[in-house]
Amino acid sequence: MTHTHDHEHDHNHEPDYITLVDENGNESLFQILITIDGQEEFGKNYVVLQPTEFEEDEQGLIDVLAYSFTENADGTEGDLQPIPEDAEDEWDMIEEVFNSFMDEQED
């Protein structure tokens, strides 16, 4: 199955940050790498985050997190929701858009 890259995403060069609070109340700061408009295909938007304090693995890779979100009716930011592991179409789209974004960053 092929997927065209027709999703809008933010190429903002000024980094934005978000603080996430885990179930134990610990706060962690993340940089927002990219937001993806998936409204037309999936009815929600997505965000890919990178911890501001991270360690690369032995291959030089860094773990990133992806969440879905819907904006509040007044246009303000909404809540982040985990993306189900079995939502293969959503994960495929996120991976494709994120990889394209990373390729553009390397140019």
Curated annotation (Swiss-Prot):
It holds the Pfam family DUF1292. InterPro entries: UPF0473. This is UPF0473 protein LL0144. Belongs to the UPF0473 family.
